[in-house]
């Protein structure tokens, strides 16, 4: 006779790794073309001037400049402001 009862198998115990989403370049930060500004699911933050939108809704810089977050008509919008050449 067994002195211990057989342990039942659990059907839980799995989890997926976090997707590393969020703002990657903050307001006022210097960016170059191609820099990722925001990684997101859906357009939580909308693209504005001088930024592109990837097929996975990633917002990235199209020009060299400074990141600017603004609110327009209840939408968060991100722009890249061109730096005036000296």
UniProtKB/Swiss-Prot annotation:
<protein>
    <recommendedName>
        <fullName>Large ribosomal subunit protein bL27</fullName>
    </recommendedName>
</protein>
<keyword id="KW-0689">Ribosomal protein</keyword>
<feature type="region of interest" description="Disordered">
    <location>
        <begin position="1"/>
        <end position="26"/>
    </location>
</feature>
<dbReference type="GO" id="GO:1990904">
    <property type="term" value="C:ribonucleoprotein complex"/>
</dbReference>
<comment type="similarity">
    <text>Belongs to the bacterial ribosomal protein bL27 family.</text>
</comment>
<dbReference type="GO" id="GO:0006412">
    <property type="term" value="P:translation"/>
</dbReference>
<dbReference type="GO" id="GO:0005840">
    <property type="term" value="C:ribosome"/>
</dbReference>
<dbReference type="InterPro" id="IPR001684">
    <property type="entry name" value="Ribosomal_bL27"/>
</dbReference>
<keyword id="KW-0687">Ribonucleoprotein</keyword>
<dbReference type="GO" id="GO:0003735">
    <property type="term" value="F:structural constituent of ribosome"/>
</dbReference>
<dbReference type="Pfam" id="PF01016">
    <property type="entry name" value="Ribosomal_L27"/>
</dbReference>
<dbReference type="InterPro" id="IPR018261">
    <property type="entry name" value="Ribosomal_bL27_CS"/>
</dbReference>
């Amino acid at each position: 006779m067994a002195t211990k009862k057989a342990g039942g198998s659990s059907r839980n115990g799995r989890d997926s790794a976090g997707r590393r989403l969020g703002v990657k370049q903050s307001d006022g930060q210097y960016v170059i073309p191609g820099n990722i500004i925001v990684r997101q699911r859906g357009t939580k933050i909308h693209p504005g001037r001088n930024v592109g939108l990837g097929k996975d809704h990633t917002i990235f810089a199209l020009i060299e400049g400074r990141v600017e977050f603004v609110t327009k008509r209840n939408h968060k919008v991100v722009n890249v402001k061109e730096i005036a050449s000296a």
